[in-house]
Amino acid sequence: MKRSKVERQSMLKEKIELTPFVTDEQLAKEFHVSIQTIRLDRMELAIPELRERIKHVATNQWNETVKALPLEEVIGEVIDLELDERAISIMDITPDLVFSRNKIARGHHIFAQANSLAVAVINDELALTAKSNLKFTRQVNEGERVIAKAIVKGKDNRDRTIVEVSSYVENELVFTGEFFMFHSSNEKGEN
């Protein structure tokens, strides 16, 4: 049964409020309409596009929290952060991030998302990657969304913070990395 425009827009607004990181494509499938219809509905309702919604949430929630680097230097969009505990970021694989011939994401972008998230999760003004162990488990293609999840695991025998980052595309592991983070409190004998 086809919904009226008013009913669809009301449901659309509610859906975006509940899940602000939902894409227009996902909304179009859910509401059985074209992507253009979703975009027109969003415009009429003054709901910004996904990237702007993400930036709004990230800026409002994390700008004062991230210490080790400016939020705009984190690769991907931070959507969850608890310093010295965990962090999550998302990155859409756009044409500028892939090889032109095969549309596969360049590995350094996947690494950069994970590494910058490992830096961002550290509760210190200075955090640097001292060492990392990485594994790419499958290629990532243009149009896919990478969700990176960082978890602080503890300290190594040199007092460096160990951050484990796992990156997923639709719940499939595509990258994993163990980052050994040096930070300025290491020098001061703190933490």
UniProtKB/Swiss-Prot annotation:
One of its GO terms (molecular function) is DNA-binding transcription factor activity. The keyword Glycoprotein does not apply. The keyword Membrane does not apply. This is Transcription factor FapR. The gene is fapR. Belongs to the FapR family. One of its GO terms (biological process) is negative regulation of DNA-templated transcription. It comes from Oceanobacillus iheyensis (strain DSM 14371 / CIP 107618 / JCM 11309 / KCTC 3954 / HTE831). NCBIfam families: PRK04424.1 (NF003359). Keywords: DNA-binding, Fatty acid biosynthesis, Fatty acid metabolism, Lipid biosynthesis, Lipid metabolism, Repressor, Transcription, Transcription regulation. Transcriptional factor involved in regulation of membrane lipid biosynthesis by repressing genes involved in fatty acid and phospholipid metabolism. Coiled coil: none annotated. InterPro entries: HotDog_dom_sf, Transcription_factor_FapR, WH-like_DNA-bd_sf.
